Amino acid sequence: AEVPAAADSATVHPVPLPLAPDAAVQWLAAEQSNSSLVIGESVIVKLFRRVVAGVHPEMEMTRHLTRIGYANTAALIGEIAHESAGGERSTLAVVQSFVPNQGDAWTWALDYLRRTIDELAVLTEAVSAGDGEMAPTAVSEARTDTDEALAGYLAFIGAIGTRLGELHVALAAPSDDPAFGTGIANADDAAFWTARVREQLTRALDHLAAWQAANGPNADVDWLLSQRDALLEAARERALGGLGAMLERIHGDFHLGQVLVAQGDAFLIDFEGEPARPVDERRRKTSPLRDVAGLVRSLDYVVGAMRQGPEHVAGPAQERRDRLLERFLNASTERFLDTYAAAIQAPPSEDGACALDMDLLDLFLLEKAAYEVNYEAANRPTWLPIPLAGLAHVARRLLHADVPPAVALDPLGGPP
């Protein structure tokens, strides 16, 4: 809703800020729905370009998390709000403590993977150039370095799982505020989930058909188009299977870009949800597995971006790179899910499998991958193969079709 221009006012209740009179001001890169500036490296002001009437999710969530003492986010200091002549309130900006950081987890992951691949390339070239007696030693050293690099990557991805789990536990705690606490999924929630998946999947399949017509045959696209009705029915069944699941407030737009890397720990930011969605929908309690799906897809995306990136390799070098990326993807996804499940104290299943509701998680993974197809079709068609592969993978799992097994491959070519 637009804020009326007449008879409006903006009220500010002074709050002491730890700022020097000559504190430096730094504008950060503009995001989709907001612009931010850092003042004195102690305060960050987020200005919303999409002003909406009523309770703003970012303000509501950060205020609640600050009140209950959730540590791994930027604490709320205050807000700048507009109030119309009729008493309708709109948040124009929020003021938060600044978290000193080394950047977001998306950039960190890209840099980490790129560095690891470059180092592997140097080592494998040395192996190829070495004599027969030295080759086994060089191979052993290369494998050790790769294992150490993987351990470092998994340590931080595991921290994200822990912090997200702690966030969900905090948001599920009993509260005097009815906007928080938990609920139970009912038929309306299942219908809502089904409708969202139907909306995204239908559009995605239409985009894929058009993309294939312009780019030539693609086996994944052919298969997905042939399974349209079966996928929609499988999504409906998964949504109904979620009846009785716990609901709560969630982050709502969780991915690696919403995580700050700070002194080796993970800080979660940007709680406004998907900006294009209606505010009431963003504030609705839903399954926390929606956030989990967002991060799982983001882990896949960063690997896809590495394959899609400017590094042009071919032949054995490409095969080694792809094996390494697949190993990192499989291991990081498993570590994230394990640490998340441990943080929420999810009871293990009888067969020792993942303690989370994987059927419901797959529903949200399907929706997220379809959303990504729609986004790339509209904005970056050359990136569309990344979500296409993810959509085909989760769709095959939903329909119990043949899915290539995830194998921990040695990037140097032999068994791990």
Report each predicted region and the residues it spans.
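A structural signal for well-ordered alpha-helices, especially hydrophobic packing surfaces
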Residues: 168-171, 201, 205, 232-236, ...
